[in-house]
Swiss-Prot record:
Official protein name in the record: Phosphoglucosamine mutase
Keyword annotations of the record: Isomerase, Magnesium, Metal-binding, Phosphoprotein
GO cellular component annotations of the record: cytosol
Organism: Streptomyces avermitilis (strain ATCC 31267 / DSM 46492 / JCM 5070 / NBRC 14893 / NCIMB 12804 / NRRL 8165 / MA-4680)
Active site, UniProt feature: S104 (phosphoserine intermediate)
Enzyme Commission number(s) of this protein: 5.4.2.10
Transferase as UniProt keyword: no
Family, as annotated: Belongs to the phosphohexose mutase family.
Family annotation (InterPro entries): A-D-PHexomutase_a/b/a-I, A-D-PHexomutase_a/b/a-I/II/III, A-D-PHexomutase_a/b/a-II, A-D-PHexomutase_a/b/a-III, A-D-PHexomutase_C, A-D-PHexomutase_C_sf, Alpha-D-phosphohexomutase_SF, GlmM_bact
Record-listed Phosphoserine modification sites: S104
C-alpha cells in the first residue's frame, strides 16, 4: 500500500479513493495510536470533528464519528466550519484529537481527512505513519480491541463553535475596520458564515460572493483559485480590497482596489512589516517555502528582515516556526500562519489582519503590497508522470542544469512532485516573462519525456 498521508492529510475522490470504510478504519487507527502514545492516559478521550460543506462530507463524517466512538472516544460535532476553526477549537476545548473533513481547494468530488493533535497542531509524520501501519494491520485481519457498555464513545452536537472562533478572531485583531469596504469570496465553502460575521463585527462594510454552499458548488469558479469574479466585484463596488478563501478557508488571497491580485508572498510582506511595527515579528524573521517568489526574498533583505526557506507545505513552514520560535510564515498560495494566534493557516484571520493594516495606515493595499516586486514566475503542472523519479532521473537532471545555465543569477528553476495530486510542478523565475515561459515549456516537455 502506498503512503495514504500526503502533505495535507489523506485526500482522494470521495467514495472511490476515500471511502466510508477507509475513513472509519483510519479513525479507529488514530484513536488506538494516540492511546498507545499516552495521549488519552488518565481521562476519557474527546475529539472535535468538523467538515466543509461538500456533499460527501456528510457520509464521511458519519464514518469518522462511528470509528472514533467505537474506539471509546467521545465526539463533539461542530458541523461546517473552516479548518483553522476546527484546529482552534481542538485546543480551546482541551480535546485530545481534531478531525477535519475537507479537500481544501480541490474540486467537489474530492474530499480529505486531516487529523490534529492536542492543542490543534497537525499530527507529526511519525504518528501518521503509525496510523497507516495500524490501519493496514487491522484491515488485513487483526481484530480491534473494542470497548463495550459505558466504554463506547458518546456523540454530542456542539453548536457554539462558530461563535467561539469568531470571538477569538476579534480578540486578536490589532484595530477595527471601520470605514473599509471589503468584498469577500467564500468559495461556497466552510467560511461562508463565519468570515462575513467576523468582518462585520470588526466594523467593515462587506459585499459577499460565493457564500451560498449547496454541497455541490464548492470552489466552482470562485474562491482563491478563481479570482475573476472577485476582481470584477471589487471594481464594481469601489471596494478597498477583496479577500478570497478556498473551500476550507485555510488560505487567503487578496485583490487590491484596482482588481489586481495580491498573492501570499505579498501578503506575508505586508504583514511582516506590520508585525515588526508592533514588535510582534520575533527575531525579525519570516518563514516561507522554496516556491516563494525571489522578489519576496529580496524585499525582506532590503527591509532588514531575515528569510528562512522550507520545503513546500504549510506543515513544514509550521515545523520551522515552532522549532525556532518564529511568529510569521506561509506560502505563495495563501497559507499564512500567525503562530501567536493560530496553529495552522487561517484565511479569515489573514484577511482580517490585511484589512486592518489598510485601515490603520490609510494606504491602499496596492501601495502596501508594492514593498515587493514579483519577478516573472511561470508554473506548469505536468500530469500523469512518475513523480517519484523527479530526483533520480539523469535525463531530467541534465535538462535542469541546462535551464539553470541559461537563467544565470537572475532566475531559478524548481521541479516538485505534488504532495496531494498525481503531477509534477515545474516552476521557473526569470528576468522577463517570455524567457520564463520558454524555459518552463522546455522543462515541462523534458518531464514528460523523462517521467512519462
Amino acid at each position: 500500500m502506498g503512503r495514504l498521508f500526503g502533505t495535507d492529510g489523506v485526500r482522494g475522490v470521495a467514495n472511490a479513493d476515500l471511502t466510508a470504510e477507509l475513513a472509519l478504519g483510519l479513525s479507529v487507527a488514530a484513536a488506538h495510536v494516540l492511546a498507545e502514545a499516552g495521549t488519552f492516559e488518565g481521562h476519557r478521550p474527546v475529539a472535535v470533528v468538523g467538515r466543509d460543506p461538500r456533499a460527501s462530507g456528510e457520509f464521511l463524517e458519519a464514518a469518522v464519528v462511528a470509528g472514533l466512538a467505537s474506539a471509546g472516544v467521545d465526539v463533539l460535532l461542530v458541523g461546517v466550519l473552516p479548518t483553522p476553526a476546527v484546529a482552534h477549537l481542538t485546543g480551546a476545548l482541551g480535546a485530545d484529537l481534531g478531525v477535519m473533513l475537507s479537500a481544501s481547494h480541490n474540486a467537489m468530488p474530492d474530499n480529505g481527512i486531516k487529523f490534529f493533535a492536542r492543542g490543534g497542531h497537525k499530527l507529526a509524520d511519525d504518528l501518521e505513519d503509525r496510523i497507516e501501519a495500524v490501519y493496514e494491520e487491522h484491515r488485513t485481519g487483526a481484530p480491534w480491541d473494542r470497548p463495550t457498555g459505558a466504554g463506547v464513545g458518546r456523540v454530542t452536537s456542539y453548536g457554539e463553535g462558530a461563535d467561539q472562533y469568531v470571538a477569538h478572531l476579534m480578540s486578536v485583531l490589532p484595530n477595527r475596520l471601520d470605514g473599509i469596504k471589503v468584498v469577500l469570496d467564500e468559495a461556497h465553502g466552510a467560511a461562508a458564515r463565519v468570515s462575513p460575521d467576523a468582518f462585520t463585527r470588526a466594523g467593515a462594510e462587506i459585499i459577499t460572493i460565493g457564500a451560498e454552499p449547496d454541497g455541490l458548488n464548492i470552489n466552482d469558479g470562485c474562491g482563491s483559485t478563481h479570482l475573476a469574479k472577485l476582481r470584477a466585484a471589487v471594481v464594481e463596488h469601489g471596494a478597498d480590497l477583496g479577500i478570497a478563501h478556498d473551500g476550507d478557508a485555510d488560505r487567503c488571497l487578496a485583490v487590491d482596489h484596482t482588481g489586481a491580485e495580491v498573492d501570499g508572498d505579498q501578503i506575508l510582506a505586508v504583514l511582516a512589516l506590520a508585525m515588526r511595527e508592533r514588535s510582534a515579528l520575533r527575531s525579525d524573521t519570516v518563514v516561507a517555502t522554496v516556491m516563494s517568489n525571489l522578489g519576496f526574498k529580496l524585499a525582506m533583505e532590503r527591509e532588514g528582515l531575515s528569510f528562512v526557506q522550507t520545503a513546500v507545505g504549510d506543515r513544514y513552514v509550521l515545523e520551522e516556526m515552532k522549532e525556532h520560535g518564529y511568529a510569521l510564515g506561509g506560502e505563495q498560495s495563501g497559507h499564512v500562519i500567525i503562530l501567536d494566534h493560530a496553529t495552522t493557516g487561517d484565511g479569515t484571520l489573514t484577511g482580517l489582519l490585511l484589512a486592518a493594516r489598510v485601515a490603520q495606515t490609510g494606504r491602499t493595499l496596492q501601495d502596501l503590497a508594492s514593498v515587493m516586486e514579483r519577478l516573472p514566475q511561470v508554473l506548469v503542472n505536468v500530469p500523469d508522470v512518475d513523480r517519484a523519479r523527479v530526483k533520480t532521473s539523469a535525463e531530467l537532471a541534465t535538462a535542469v542544469a541546462e535551464a539553470e545555465r541559461e537563467l544565470g543569477a537572475t532566475g531559478r528553476v524548481l521541479l516538485r512532485p505534488s504532495g496531494t495530486e498525481p503531477l509534477v510542478r515545474v516552476m521557473v523565475e526569470a528576468a522577463d516573462i517570455e524567457q520564463a515561459r520558454s524555459v518552463a515549456g522546455r522543462l515541462a516537455d523534458a518531464v514528460k519525456s523523462a517521467l512519462g
